[in-house]
Every structure is written in C-alpha cells, then in structure tokens.
Amino acid sequence: MARLLPLVATHPEPPINAPLHTPNAAEAHAVVRDGRPLRVALLGYRSAPFSGGQGVYLRYLSQALMQLGHDVTVISGPPYPHLVEGVKLVQLPSLDLYSRDLWSVTREELGDSLGRKEWFSKLSGGFAEPETFGERVRDWLLDHADEFDVVHDNQTLAEGILDLQRAGLPVVTTIHHPITRDLRVALAGEPRWWWRLMIRRWHRFLGMQSRVAAQLRHIVTVSRCSAADIATDFGVRPGPLHVVRNGVGTA
C-alpha cells in the first residue's frame, strides 16, 4: 500500500479559498516507486465522453497521470471514453441498455447471468450497471493483478471493488459526492407517488454503494462539503477520507 498513498494525500488540505496546488518536478518524482512509474488502472462503469462527467473526468485524470510519467490503463463499460494517445483502454462490454431498445436483447445475451441481471433490472425500473461492472472488472483484474500497482475506482462502489481490496489489490476510490443527495433532490421535486416509487427503485444501487463505501480503506473526494456528506450518508469514518480538490487547467 506504500505505493498508493502519495497519489491519495501528498499534502494536507488547503484552506477553502486557497489557490490550487500544482505539483512541481520534485513532487512528480516522489510518486515514482522502485525506479519506475506506477502502473495505474482507472475504473469507470460508464464513461460517456460528452455527458454525465465520468468520461470527462477519466480523460483528464488519465492524461495528467500519464504526463507525470505513469503507465495508465482505463477499464470501462460502455459508452467508452475518448482518451488521449498513450492511455490504454480495456473495454468491458455490457448490454448498455441506455443506448438500445430493451427488446433488442438477444437470447444469447440473456444467457449470461450479468446480462440477465441488467435486463431484468432495467425492465423493473432499476439501474444495475455499477453492480454488474463491479463483477466484470473484479474478474478481469484478478486475472491481471500483477500488471498494476494501483487500482483507482471512479465511484462504482460495487461489491466487486470490495472483493479486489479483500484480495490484496491496492484500491482507492473517488467519490465525487454521494448520490443520496441526487435522490433527495429528485424526490423533493416529484409530487406524484408512483413516480416517487420509480425514483426510489432506480436508486436502489445506493444501498450497495453505502455498504461498500463504509468498508473501503482509501477514499478520495473533492471538497470538505462532499467529505461531510459521504461521512453522513454512507457512514464513512474520517480516517479513509482524503480531500483532493479537482484541478483546473489555466492554459
């Protein structure tokens, strides 16, 4: 785990209104271990390049890590991110039911247990992608565990991610904010009881995310406010939480 920590919390958190910190050459060198760059796996259960934010985040984070000299691989479910040259992409296909008709799924696709889970979840108004991606990426990484020094999960928060930690892989997770906050906003704006039921159904993955987050050893978030929300809503103790502010490009 010694290799992981410099990427998570190299500096104490600055005051709220402090300028963002830019690593200098010495600090960039400090995250290199054993005379070689780190081999970083960045995980995203869906990484659309132009909407939702996850694909944008993975593009810029992977680019910055590569510019620091690290060997970066993004492992993603569909839709896949647009990455800069030099960053590798491992595609883990799913049914991707938000880009196709539910009834276009073939019998062969439903022969897979994870495919069935995605299909029946979508049929009943749920969202199973974080859970199913967690299982797929767990199986893939356990087969390639010796190829990476750090596994950085982008808010999948699935049981499969916890399995990787239990297996001894160095795992860090970014939680931008707990989606429990989105759920509250959605419920507050919907007076119709049947739609409120559907909103709660879609957000059922939050039970899994809360259980997983409370057991993770290393969590990155982007602000003190998000850290407080994560502690309150997900029951995360202060120890695993590290605030690392989002970078801002000034060029």
Question: Predicted regions span which residues?
Answer:
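A short beta-strand/loop micro-motif in the catalytic core of glycosyltransferases
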Residues: 152, 198, 215-224
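Acceptor-binding helix/loop patch of EC 2.4 sugar-transfer enzymes
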Residues: 102-125, 165-207
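Structural alpha-helical scaffold elements that stabilize or flank donor/cofactor-binding regions
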Residues: 144, 211-212
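An aromatic- and histidine-rich active-site surface loop
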Residues: 125-142, 150-184
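Residues at the starts of beta-strands that form the adenosine-phosphate
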Residues: 39, 71, 170, 217-218, ...
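Carbohydrate-associated surface elements
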Residues: 225, 247
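A conserved catalytic-core segment of Leloir-type glycosyltransferases
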Residues: 2-20, 24-38, 64, 74-141
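Short amphipathic alpha-helix
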Residues: 54-65
